[in-house]
Amino acid sequence: MKIHPFTFLYLFLAYWGHSSYYVAFLLFSILHEIGHYLVALYFSFEIEKIMILPFGAFLSLKDLGKHYVYEEIGMLLCGPFINLICFIFFLFIKEPLLAKINIYILIFNLLPVYPLDGSKLLLLFLSYFIDYQKAMQIQIKVSLLFICILWIITKQIGRKIILGYLFYQVILYLKNYRLIYMETLMSDHLSKKRVKINK
């Protein structure tokens, strides 16, 4: 697990400003990624790292896109599922702020914007019907479209910073997606994904 240096700065500022909201948001974001991590371990994904960023956490996998569809769907949905359970729990014990944080993390991660869970689920869905490379191209276009829409309707500077980071990640993905596609083909897992969905 790696922690981005700016994360410590944000935590210090949150402590100095008595912002428990930010600390809770970061903790539940980490819990979200732990959900991904545990399922990734169970299905023997090749885990590269978990990075704790100032505005959340991110699990990096070396072999994402090279497993059976049910394994990847299970891994991708486990993070949002953790937040859904937390949302229901905090509603039940009447902690609306913590419930709000978890439903926000859940909805945000299901947006079809790379590298969020929703974008990867979209890629899995599209790749079952069309060529994988074409699916990746659509994934990138949808990501850029949603970033533009969210940038226009978002007023808060903190959210715009997050959108800027997502835009940067999409551009990196755009530069490398052909290489990722070739690696996926060479791994000989693409045909398994199309055939062995329920096994």
Language model segments and positions:
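Hydrophobic transmembrane alpha-helices and their immediate loop junctions
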Residues: 1-199
